[in-house]
């Protein structure tokens, strides 16, 4: 669920306070008692990398569409009335940043900035350095705890009350930050690297799967295909009718997320070449107005209707605002079987009546929770 803060500056103040308290408090009261000079330099280098990457994630613009951008025929045409520019594929208008953002992932309350095409590598490096530093610190703290525990019954003059107090405070705090930030990095890796998706596109996939589960997706994507490729009729009408008459069709057989090429290509598209992943100022390899696509996306007029459907831009049902009406909405279903009438209660999902801009996933997240200005979608 998206986090919303009453005072937006707390989004930066809280992480900065935790980084400073855990990083420098642990060094001064604990690590300086037993680490060598070189080890302390290495530790502080990691702390510095946190601050550098955090600064860049905050102050680097996530990417603005060029004023003269013109979408290709293979994309949905989506014009932003506020920015007065066509949005490139994967771009959205952020209601907080008040701009269209290239390959918008989400608006992050912890950076007071959108995470988009241009600053996604900085955001990922920030998460990486926080995890690496807190994991390294936790390793040192656990080792120190073990040592102090093993010599607890011996008389030694190096025992420090302040060190023991700060170990008791810093260890659980450090572990908490490590676990929470690791879960966020894991989500980013799962979406961007394994599936080539932004968080918004992952939400969109949930919506598409929900439409398919309700048997409402196939007819909509066929409508979109016919609108874009009217020349396929009447030659493909029989194939379309046959497909619609099937009792069940797997979603993977007619929908395709075009930006999922393979994990290695996905991560290089987002982060740049591997040897620059940890370089603080490295950028993505493209300007963010077009992206590599998998082979299923490319249209072939001689292919099957299923393959043609896979060539639709994302999302395949189009950038629609309203969904089709669904009858009376009654939860009572009547079935006649073997001469007997059976009446049963059929659960109704209230989301069935919602369009794209109002639909929410199982976490309660809608497009606006990711920072998207839904009035301009």
From Swiss-Prot:
- Where is it localised? Endoplasmic reticulum membrane
Pfam families cross-referenced by the UniProt entry: DHHC
Q: Which GO terms describe its molecular function?
A: protein-cysteine S-palmitoyltransferase activity
Q: Which residues cross the membrane?
A: 10-30, 123-143, 164-184
Instruction: Say where the protein is mainly found.
Output: endoplasmic reticulum
Q: Classify the protein's membrane topology as the record does.
A: Multi-pass membrane protein
Which ranges make up the Cytoplasmic topological domains here? 1-9, 144-163
Q: Which domain of life is it from?
A: Eukaryota
Residue span(s) of domain DHHC:
78-128
Please tell me whether the keyword NAD is annotated for this protein: no
Q: Which GO terms describe its cellular component?
A: endoplasmic reticulum membrane
Keywords associated with the record? Acyltransferase, Endoplasmic reticulum, Lipoprotein, Membrane, Palmitate, Transferase, Transmembrane, Transmembrane helix
Which reaction equation describes what this protein catalyses?
A: L-cysteinyl-[protein] + hexadecanoyl-CoA = S-hexadecanoyl-L-cysteinyl-[protein] + CoA
In short, the EC number is: 2.3.1.225
Active-site residues per Swiss-Prot or TrEMBL entry: 108
Provide the function of this protein. Answer: Mediates the reversible addition of palmitate to target proteins, thereby regulating their membrane association and biological function.
What does the UniProt entry state concerning the protein's domains? The DHHC domain is required for palmitoyltransferase activity.
PANTHER family reported for this sequence: PALMITOYLTRANSFERASE ZDHHC16
Question: By what name is this protein known?
Answer: Palmitoyltransferase PFA4
Q: Which lineage is the organism of this entry classified under, starting from the top rank?
A: Eukaryota, Fungi, Dikarya, Ascomycota, Saccharomycotina
Name the gene behind this protein. Answer: PFA4
């Amino acid at each position: 669920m998206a986090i919303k803060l009453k005072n937006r500056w707390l989004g930066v103040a809280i992480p900065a306070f935790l980084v400073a308290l855990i990083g420098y408090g642990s060094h001064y009261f604990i690590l300086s008692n037993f680490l060598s000079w070189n080890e302390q330099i290495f530790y502080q280098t990691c702390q510095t990398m946190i601050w550098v990457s955090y600064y860049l994630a905050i102050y680097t613009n996530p990417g603005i569409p060029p004023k003269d951008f013109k979408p290709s025929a293979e994309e949905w045409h989506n014009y932003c009335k506020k920015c007065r520019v066509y949005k490139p594929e994967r771009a959205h208008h952020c209601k907080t940043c008040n701009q269209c953002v290239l390959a918008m992932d989400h608006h992050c309350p912890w950076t007071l900035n959108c995470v988009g095409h241009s600053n996604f590598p900085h955001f990922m490096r920030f998460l990486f350095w926080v995890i690496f530093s807190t994991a390294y610190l936790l390793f040192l703290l656990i080792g120190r705890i073990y040592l102090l525990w093993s010599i607890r019954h011996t008389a030694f003059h190096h025992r420090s009350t302040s060190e023991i107090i700060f170990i008791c405070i810093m260890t659980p705090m450090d572990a908490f930050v490590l676990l929470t930030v690791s879960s966020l990095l894991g989500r980013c890796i799962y979406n961007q690297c394994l599936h080539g998706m932004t968080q918004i596109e992952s939400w969109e996939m949930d919506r598409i799967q929900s439409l398919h589960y309700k048997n409402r997706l196939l007819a909509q994507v066929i409508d979109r295909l016919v609108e874009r490729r009217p020349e396929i009729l009447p030659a493909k009408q029989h194939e379309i009718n046959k497909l619609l008459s099937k009792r069940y069709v797997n979603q993977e057989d007619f929908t395709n997320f075009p930006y999922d090429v393979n994990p290695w290509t996905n991560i290089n598209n987002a982060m740049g070449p591997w040897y620059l992943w940890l370089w603080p100022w490295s950028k993505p390899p493209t300007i963010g107005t077009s992206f590599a696509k998998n082979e299923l996306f490319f249209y072939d007029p001689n292919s099957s209707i299923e393959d043609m459907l896979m060539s639709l831009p994302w999302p395949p049902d189009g950038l629609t605002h309203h969904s089709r009406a669904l009858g009376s909405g009654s939860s009572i279903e009547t079935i006649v079987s073997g001469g007997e009438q059976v009446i049963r209660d059929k659960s109704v999902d209230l989301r069935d009546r919602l369009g794209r801009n109002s639909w929410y996933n199982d976490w309660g997240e809608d497009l606006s929770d990711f920072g998207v200005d839904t009035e301009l979608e």
